[in-house]
Amino acid sequence: NNLYTIDAVTGAATQVGSGPFAPATNGSSFGFDFNPVIDRIRVVSDANQNLVLNPNDGTSTQVTSLFFGAGDVNFGMDPNIVGSAYTNSYAGAMSTQLYGIDTGLDILVTQANSAGTLMTVGSIGVDLNDTLSFDISGASGFAYATVVSDDFSSSTFWQINLADGSATALGEIGGGALITSMTVVPAPGALAMLGLGGLAGSRRRR
């Protein structure tokens, strides 16, 4: 496993660090986002892995595996977190909250910023699969997700309510694009979405 920076203009990839990071990722579907307060990358997986990556030298640190906290309605259930996003995702943020999407239970959760403790926010109300992406706008605080259909024929763009977890469909993404990773970025007078179709990608700092 290696960490790369991507030039937003040319698309050129540059490896961070001298080699593969360890511990390596474990799982088949992943959530990935920057913690804007400490400038570290959180990576979680459907195998309940919970890693912190250093974007400066490419090293990784294993922290507590994902689990539902005591007293939570889903305590004792096996999580399946495949989308992760932080609030207040902008330079100089003083506080942040990490959210995740569990595609096994079709719910929105919060995750402790230093540990793997999950707490249920609410039902998303959509039968999800693992081919999705999730991000929260640093400018507006609105949360969005893309979900690829089960037959891999289309992707739908959703807005996620962070207060109760409910999802509202904003429409099918045109051209039959299969969006597997996206980030919400501020643009003059509009909200822009950058996406990668057909292959896994990573988010950039906003």
Predicted features, each with a name:
Residues 85-133:
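A mid-sequence, solvent-exposed acidic-amphipathic segment
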Residues 23-38, 76-94, 130-140, 180-184:
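Structural signature of eukaryotic scaffold interfaces centered on beta-propeller domains
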Residues 178-194:
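Short, threonine-centered small-residue motifs that mark membrane-proximal processing/anchoring sites
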Residues 13-21, 60-73, 110-127, 168-176:
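Beta-propeller fold detector
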Residues 1, 38-45, 97-102, 141-148:
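Short beta-strand elements that form the blades of beta-propeller/WD-repeat-like
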Residues 7-10, 55-58, 112-115, 161-164:
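Short loop/turn segments that connect beta-strands within beta-propeller blades
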Residues 189-206:
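C-terminal cell-surface anchoring/sorting signal
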Residues 1-5, 48-53, 105-112, 152-158:
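Structural motif
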